[in-house]
Curated annotation (Swiss-Prot):
Subunit structure: Protein phosphatase 6 (PP6) holoenzyme is proposed to be a heterotrimeric complex formed by the catalytic subunit, a SAPS domain-containing subunit (PP6R) and an ankyrin repeat-domain containing regulatory subunit (ARS).
Pfam families reported for this sequence: Ank, Ank_2, Ank_5
Keyword field contains rRNA-binding: no
Keywords: ANK repeat, Repeat
Function recorded in the entry: Putative regulatory subunit of protein phosphatase 6 (PP6) that may be involved in the recognition of phosphoprotein substrates.
Gene: ankrd52
Repeat region (ANK), residues: 7-36, 40-69, 73-102, 106-135, 139-168, 172-201, 205-234, 238-267, 271-301, 305-334, 338-367, 371-400, 422-451, 455-484, 488-539, 543-573, 578-607, 611-640, 645-674, 681-710, 714-743, 747-776, 784-814, 816-845, 852-881, 885-915, 919-951, 955-984
Organism of provenance: Danio rerio
Protein name from the UniProt record: Serine/threonine-protein phosphatase 6 regulatory ankyrin repeat subunit C
Origin: domain of life: Eukaryota
Annotated SUPFAM superfamilies: Ankyrin repeat
Length: 1071
């Protein structure tokens, strides 16, 4: 209970704490509030239960005290009594109806409280009333967990005897033995193990009881677990053994026990760290490190990042440990994966004493590490002047020269001006780091301040970019050129103007607001100092940007003001040279304060960039409403449009859904007159808002007078766009403003056509309802006679077809005779076809013909939609119906090479193979003419009439001629086996053999050669006029190619229908 002054409590509570039952009776007789609450919502009964005064408790309960009252942390009087270990109070409360399952805010029941507080008798009193001994609190711990944590052996024994689950796990999978081991309760651990607890059980992170005991340094528990068979080198989920854990936590006694028991001192974890690595880095791991080294630990073993124990010691400056490692063979110049030695690491983290030790032991100060940097680079970059001084005093290049011969006999160290991989010297690093003492040390040691990196930047560029004012002052004072340009043409002033964008962010202080303000102040001082020392604010880089541009782009208001003061009247010249203006750059990133500064300096607010985008356009596009407001207050024009698409500010605001910017534009002077302004394609802001689905912008434009029926250059309105994109909310807004639902585009399509084509059923339903109110007699056809039903069927949108069948059933039979059923089947949408055939308005369409005489069965044959073919055949389709070119569905399938359709029509429907088209082609002719070998073979297997084998078409060609010409060897063999004649000639006088020739001229030549090879005989001399040689001589002078198989236009009939204007429904609205 909270500590309160008893004298401040009500008289009843004071009487309870004085244990004066008579006074309690008196106050209760005076009707004092028995359930009064203190500031922590505790009742008098809570106080009595905590005291354990059963008589007073009984008086309070008899007077109406609530036995289950909860205080501010949900503790009941029963919780209080259990915590006080008063079994009589617990018993009384239970008899008076106290809830034994009541939970506090941590979900702990009175049993949890009693187990945690060693209240054995209270637990014995509670046990007959609880249904489960293993109920978990908020952390998942059962009463046995709390008992094990308390270390009270009798409580643990009681709960186990009553059936508590020995292996109960909390939310981190920790069992009671984990907690007992971690807290060093050896007797409890022994008891749990004797009862069968798993001494090697693991929690969610793989920690065993041995890990837990090792972490907290309980060597007696460690010894007991090891004696009872605990695996000494068992790793956890991170690969750490108990020895890793002991070394990391500095538990030398445990580490000693583990090593003596044979623990592997060189076992790496998942990151490659051994116990020695962790001992080297640990706060209290010095003794552990010495122990490991003395017991054979590998002092040069490297982690997966290449770090040795000496690297780890260097990170935290463990001076003594580094000496031990070096004395025991630790490699001084061992490099990690980044090329850094321990000296690099010590220099980075500023451990001057450790640097001395490493250098004394021969560390190479000239070894290049990450990005080719010396240790000195890192020392000055991270601002350690002591380390810098130490490295300079011992590491600079020096030579010993013989006095007589002038011969160099010894040289060591490094050249202070040696660049890293990016051309940066130590002076560049010092200028970037900002430590003025390091900078002065380098300059006094001969560092070249005019040295440039690979990007042409001097140390002054780096100091300016990082806002290092003192470094800038020193470098400028030392003679650094303030107008020196780098390879991109930028001077130090450019970088200083935008220094907050280039400052390093890996320092812990860089994120605080105070340091951000300090950085902005230093940046301003850098700009001021550079300007005072001759920096030219009008110099532009290779892209035409000056320091003013940089300050504006990065929102540095103070720098911008200072630079503008120094630019005088040159800013207007910069704006007019065709490059992007500072105002554009400020607006693009939404730096409204910089926009204000630029406007006050007199810049033109209607300046445009090279592609014609005005500043207002850019602000509207990005949605920077403060900038838009500022520009409009200066009368920025809303009429200026960019060059390519002619979009203006209203277009981009609407297209990007920036409703606040759009509202400002519409409310500006003259803005209301631009509500219907069009771009190069004739699009209005309303169309673009609908296209993007920006409902708030749509409502705003409509309220401001936008015309919903305006059309673009292709005749499409905002409604067309909403129908294509499925913008239901936008369409609702348009419909509420009486938009013309049936407005047609240049192809005669309305929004209904497009909604049906794109499958937006809900939108189609709404549009149909609106159209029915406005123009109920409209046939809903486009220029080619197609209705929304055609489009829905063509794309297989069954939900749209259902809407049309329900709301506009008559439209199914209207329009182009190439019906919706044809459209569904030709694209293989059998589900849509079935839906149409099942409807009452379409049940007579199964044999309907289009303008070319084609039935739905023809369409299904083209698509090889087996399901569609079966569907129309079940509905009574005429299998042998022919179109105007004389072709049946089988002939169409053979012509298109749809072998599945051919097989179905032949085997199941028994299609007539003797049918001829207008050019006397059979199905076999058509299959061979397109080289559809599989179809030809299927047809051949079903031909039982030999006449069909040698049937000729209008050009006297047999299937053998055509198959031979197309190189169908399998079909030719089958035809020959079926008795196809090899001497029959076509109208060109060619036999099937000559038909194999690539063209007519080749065939003629082949015939001449064959004729000369024949032996002379009376039979040959008296050959009939129709013999091949005579016919060939008749045409031997003709060299034109043999004409193709006549098809009366049918060959391309369906192709045109699928891709042309008659059948092939072209794509819907594309933007």
């Amino acid at each position: 209970m909270g500590v309160l002054n008893i004298s401040d409590q009500p008289p009843l509570v004071q009487a309870i704490f004085n244990r004066n039952a008579d006074e309690v009776k008196l106050f209760l007789h005076k009707k004092d509030e028995v359930n009064a609450l203190d500031q922590e919502r505790r009742t008098p009964l809570h106080a009595a239960a905590w005291l354990g005064d059963v008589h007073i408790m009984d008086l309070l309960i008899s007077a109406g005290a609530n036995v289950n009252a909860k205080d501010h942390v949900w503790l009941t009087p029963l919780h209080r009594a259990a915590a006080s270990r008063n079994e009589r109070a617990v018993g009384l409360l239970l008899r008076k109806g106290a809830d034994v399952t009541a939970r506090d805010k941590y979900w702990q029941t009175p049993l949890h409280i009693a187990a945690a507080n060693r209240a054995t008798r209270c637990v014995e009193t509670l046990l007959p009333h609880v249904s489960s001994l293993n109920m978990a609190d908020r952390t998942g711990r059962a009463p046995l967990h709390h008992a094990a944590q308390s270390g009270y052996q009798e409580m643990v024994k009681l709960l186990l005897n009553k059936g508590a689950n020995l292996s109960a796990s909390d939310k981190k999978d920790r069992q009671p033995i984990h907690w007992a081991a971690y807290l060093g309760h050896l007797e409890v651990v022994k008891l749990l193990v004797s009862q069968g607890s798993d001494k090697s059980c693991k929690d969610k992170r793989g920690y065993t009881p041995l890990h837990a005991a090792a972490a907290s340094g309980h060597v007696d528990v460690v010894k007991y677990l090891l004696r009872n068979g605990a695996e000494i080198d068992e790793p956890n989920a991170f690969g750490n053994t108990a020895l890793h854990v002991a070394c990391y936590t500095g538990q030398e006694a445990v580490a000693n026990e583990l090593v003596n028991r044979g623990a592997n001192v060189n076992q790496p974890n998942h990151r490659g760290y051994t116990p020695l690595h962790l001992a080297a880095v640990s706060t209290n791991g010095a003794l552990c490190l010495e122990l490991l080294v003395n017991n054979g630990a590998d002092v040069n073993m490297q982690s997966k990042e290449g770090k040795s124990p000496l690297h780890m010691a260097a990170i935290h400056g463990r001076f003594t440990r580094s000496q031990i490692l070096i004395q025991n063979g630790g490699e001084i110049d061992c490099v990690d994966r980044y090329g850094n030695t321990p000296l690099h690491v010590a220099a980075k983290y500023g451990h001057e004493l450790l640097i001395s030790t490493l250098m004394t032991n021969g560390a190479d100060t000239a070894r290049q590490g990450i990005h080719g940097m010396f240790p000195l680079h890192l020392a000055v970059l991270y601002g350690s002047s002591d380390c810098c001084r130490k490295l300079l005093s011992s590491g600079q290049l020096y030579s010993i020269v013989l006095s007589m011969s002038k011969e160099h006999v010894l040289s060591a160290g490094f050249d202070i001006n040696t660049p890293d991989n990016f051309g940066r010297t130590c002076l560049h690093a010092a200028a970037s780091g900002g430590n003025i003492e390091c900078l002065n040390l380098l300059l006094s040691s001969g560092a070249d301040m005019n040295k440039k990196d690979k990007f042409g930047r001097t140390p002054l560029h780096y100091a300016a970019a990082n806002g290092r004012y003192q470094c800038v002052v020193v470098l400028v004072g030392a003679g650094a050129e303030v107008n020196e340009r780098d390879r991109s043409g930028c001077t130090p002033l450019h970088y200083s103007a935008a220094s907050t964008a280039f400052c390093r962010t890996d320092r812990p202080h860089a994120s605080t607001h105070q340091n951000q303000e300090d950085g902005e102040k230093e940046s301003f001082l850098c700009v001021e100092h550079l300007l005072d020392n001759g920096a030219d604010p009008c110099l532009c880089n290779t892209k035409g940007y000056s320091a003013v541009h940089y300050a504006a782009a990065h929102g540095n208001k103070q720098n911008l003001e200072l630079l503008l003061e120094m630019c005088f009247n040159t800013l207007g010249d910069k704006e007019s040279n065709g490059s992007i203006s500072p105002l554009h750059l400020a607006v693009e990133s939404g730096h409204w304060e910089c926009v204000t500064v630029l406007i006050e300096s007199g810049v033109c607010v209607d300046v445009c960039d090279p592609v014609g985008r005005s500043v207002l356009y850019l602000a509207s596009q990005r949605g920077h409403s403060r900038c838009v407001e500022l520009l409009l207050s200066q009368s920025a024009s809303c009429l200026l449009a960019e060059h390519r698409s002619k979009w203006g500010p209203l277009h981009v605001a609407a297209a990007n859904g920036h409703s606040e910017c759009l509202r400002m534009l519409l409310c500006s002077e003259g803005g209301a007159d631009l509500v219907n302004v069009t771009d190069a394609e004739g699009q209005t802001p309303l169309m673009l808002a609908v296209l993007g689905g920006h409902t708030d912008c749509v409502h705003l434009l409509l309220e401001r007078g936008a015309c919903p029926d305006m059309k673009d250059r292709r005749g499409r309105t905002a409604l067309h766009r909403g129908a294509v994109m499925g913008r239901e909310d936008c369409l609702t807004a348009l419909l509420s403003h009486n938009v013309s639902v049936l407005s047609r585009d240049f192809q005669g399509r309305s929004a209904l056509h497009l909604a049906a084509s794109c499958g937006h059923a809900d939108i189609l339903s709404n549009l149909l309802s609106a159209a029915d109110h406005s123009q109920p007699q409209d046939p809903l056809t486009d220029r080619h006679g197609y209705t929304p039903a055609h489009w829905a069927a063509y794309h297989g949108h069954e939900d749209c077809l259902e809407v049309l069948l329900e709301l506009k059933p008559c439209s199914i039979q209207e329009g182009n005779p190439f019906t919706p059923l044809h459209c569904a089947l030709i694209n293989g949408h059998s589900g849509s076809a079935e839906l149409l055939l099942e409807s009452s308005v379409c049940n007579s369409l199964v044999n309907i013909r289009d303008a070319k005489g084609r039935t739905p069965l023809h369409a299904a044959a083209v698509a090889e939609d087996v399901a569609g073919l079966q569907l129309v055949l079940r509905q009574g389709a005429d299998i042998d119906a022919v179109d105007h070119s004389g072709r049946s569905a089988l002939m169409v399938a053979a012509d298109y090479g749809q072998s599945g359709a051919v097989a179905l029509l032949l085997h199941r429907a028994k299609a007539d193979l003797s049918l001829l088209d207008v050019n006397k082609n059979t199905a076999l002719h058509l299959a061979c003419s397109k080289a559809h070998e599989m179809c030809a073979m299927l047809i051949l297997k079903e031909i039982h009439n030999p006449i069909l084998i040698n049937a000729t078409n209008s050009m006297l060609q047999m299937p053998l001629h055509i198959a031979a010409r197309n190189g169908l060897a399998t079909v030719v063999q089958a035809l020959l086996n079926r008795g196809a004649t090899v001497l029959a000639v076509d109208e060109e006088g060619h036999t099937p053999a000559l038909a194999c020739a690539s063209n007519k001229a080749v065939a003629d030549c082949l015939a001449l050669i064959l004729s000369t090879m024949k032996p002379s005989s009376s039979t040959a001399s008296s050959s009939s006029p129709s013999s091949p040689s005579l016919n060939l001589l008749k045409h031997c002078g003709i060299t034109a190619a043999c004409p193709p198989l006549p098809n009366g236009g049918l060959r391309h009939g369906y192709g045109k229908d699928r891709h042309g204007a008659t059948i092939g429904l072209d794509g819907c609205l594309t933007e």
